[in-house]
């Protein structure tokens, strides 16, 4: 039972890390774009 869980974890962990890293970068870029839009609309 543990062997299956360990293999599943080894497969899922890097995928989760990649997805969360991509989501973090996309979110940060989106926040930057929103801040630019807000600054432009005020100016």
Swiss-Prot record:
Gene Ontology terms: biological process: photosynthesis
Keyword Cell inner membrane: no
Listed transmembrane segments: 8-26
Topology class, membrane: Single-pass membrane protein
Keyword field contains Thylakoid: yes
Top-level taxonomic group: Bacteria
Compartment list: Cellular thylakoid membrane
Pfam families referenced in this protein's UniProt entry, alphabetically: PsbY
Keywords from the named record: Membrane, Photosynthesis, Photosystem II, Thylakoid, Transmembrane, Transmembrane helix
Listed InterPro entries: PSII_PsbY
One Gene Ontology term of the molecular function aspect: manganese ion binding
A cellular component term, taken from the record's GO annotations: photosystem II
Family assignment from sequence similarity: Belongs to the PsbY family.
Described purpose of this protein according to its UniProt entry: Loosely associated component of the core of photosystem II (PSII), it is not always seen in crystals. PSII is a light-driven water plastoquinone oxidoreductase, using light energy to abstract electrons from H(2)O, generating a proton gradient subsequently used for ATP formation.
Subunit structure as annotated in this protein's UniProt entry: PSII is composed of 1 copy each of membrane proteins PsbA, PsbB, PsbC, PsbD, PsbE, PsbF, PsbH, PsbI, PsbJ, PsbK, PsbL, PsbM, PsbT, PsbX, PsbY, PsbZ, Psb30/Ycf12, peripheral proteins PsbO, CyanoQ (PsbQ), PsbU, PsbV and a large number of cofactors. It forms dimeric complexes.
Protein name: Photosystem II reaction center protein Y
Annotated source species: Parasynechococcus marenigrum (strain WH8102)
């Amino acid at each position: 039972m543990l062997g299956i869980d360990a293999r599943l974890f080894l497969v899922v962990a890097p995928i989760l890390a990649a997805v969360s890293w991509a989501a973090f970068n996309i979110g940060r870029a989106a926040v930057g774009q929103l801040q630019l839009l807000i600054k432009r609309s005020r100016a």
